[in-house]
Amino acid sequence: MPVKTFRPLTPSSRYVTYADYSDITKTKPEKSLVETRKRTGGRNSYGRCTARGIGGGHKQKIRLVDFQRKKHGVEATVKAIEYDPRRTARLALLEYQDGEKTYIVAPSGLQVGAKLMSGPSAPPEVGNSLPLRTVPVGLPIHNIELIPGRGAQMVRTAGGTATLMSRDEGYAQIRLPSGEIRRVNENCYATIGQVGNAEHENVILGKAGRSRHLGIRPINRGVSRNPVDHPNGGGAGKSKSGGGWQQLTSPWGLLAKGYRTRNKKKYSNRFILVRRDGRPMKNA
């Protein structure tokens, strides 16, 4: 899917790029697979902001995506490739032989009319969901479970792909897009192939209005605020930009650069063999 660019006739069109949506085959979602949900604006039940930078935006219907693929051994046909406003990847509408319809994250190269299947006996082809114990080593995979039966939790974004490196003692070693190498139970399911819409990374919003349309609010720098509002606020000029004694922090005082917030005793550390930065995990 290519990206459209424009002549700089206006300041907002100078750098903006759009997806051409040529891969979309159906514009309206399946009614039985959508629901509405009231927006929170990043506020909790007390009305306090718990997630900054969220608010406004166009109304969006939630597509109910099947991340578990529990209909094992039943063949499904791809009926359409659809747009989902709440994720970067496209969705594929499947219709099973018994008439049931579901959405899945559309892998790259999936075409309308393709036949898909899930389960241990499914062939290792693009779009099929298999347990890691039956996936051939070296294949690209996505939609990976962390706990058997919970549903896919990793590698679901546009263009995402992981690689099955090896299997040993009931675990599969997977190289994630971040570079991390992690052990996952070989009974966990994964989908063959790469997530589609890989050109999404080349889309440039180009103007503030597109961010607001997506529900993204402006982010204000702490250095530009007053001392009462942020630990880095105040001063003449850029006196608190991280030089000298001043440490850049979050609004709540946590160091912003280099400070590790992950718990050193986190239970899942034992499953990480190589970290994202390429260094081996100490307790692996």
Where are these regions (language model features)?
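Soluble periplasmic/extracytoplasmic beta-strand elements of cell-envelope proteins
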Residues: 93-95, 173
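Short acidic-glycine loop/turn motifs at beta-strand connectors
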Residues: 96-99, 177-178
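Beta-strand/loop nucleic-acid-binding surfaces
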Residues: 99-111
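Basic, glycine/proline-rich low-complexity segments that contact nucleic acids
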Residues: 1-87, 108-284
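S1/OB-fold single-stranded RNA-binding interface
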Residues: 89-93, 101-103, 152
